[in-house]
Amino acid sequence: MGQHDWYRNKEWSEDIELAFRARLSRSRDLYNKTQYLRIQASYLLSSSDPTIQNVGLGMMNEVLSDYPDIDDVIFNKFDALVNVGDFFYRREDFETAYINYKKAIGYDKKKTVVQDHAYHGFIKSAVFSKHEEAYPAGLKYLEDARDTNLLFLSEIYDHYLASAMLYAAIGRHETAKECASVSLRVLNEESPLHMKSGLRSIDRKR
């Protein structure tokens, strides 16, 4: 076992838990402690076994409930909420996903944590669960972020997929089609430079 593998277990048992808890108890730094706990939980949430998934959810709840909202912990709480949001989004429980993404964005506003993925998940789950009150904030974020935060193809894809969904939900169907077209182009693996040029030409049409 590598030195970092003790908090990256993909299987779970009583013996594994005892070993994990023993190592975790040796960590005195709250940032590291909550990070180890969150990372281990994220591995368990990726399991196909519902029992192991529930253990992962319990660990995420530990991060969120058992530690204070201080600078050393806030980033791991933010990531925990995003991880839980992603888990429920994959299960198509969009209401629960929305609740967790919304809480994550609340941390973002408090501590200027920047993670586009949380906003994209928030917007997509808001559309699926019909939280229309979230649409104005989602639209503002998407339009403000377009030319500043998009660096990688995965970010561009997620951004324009969320944009397409939100524009369709508010009745701006032509813009939704343009955004959907961009997300499809990303799936064809066009280069980031080419993509960014194309995105700005779309922006000018709005």
Regions found by a protein language model. Give the residues of each.
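Residue at a conserved register position within TPR or TPR-like alpha-solenoid repeats
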Residues: L44-L45, L81, F88, A126-S129, ...
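N-terminal alpha-helical interaction modules that lie
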Residues: M1-D79, N83-R91, H173, K177-R206
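Short coil/turn linking the two alpha-helices of tandem helical-hairpin repeats
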Residues: S46-P50, T112, A126-E132, G171, ...
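TPR/TPR-like (Sel1-like) alpha-helical repeat modules
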Residues: Y98-G106, E133-A145, A168-S191
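Residue signature of alpha-solenoid helical repeat architecture, marking inter-repeat boundaries
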Residues: Y31-N32, F75, V113-H117, L151-E155
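Hydrophobic, well-structured mid-protein blocks that either form specific transmembrane helices
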Residues: F88-Y135
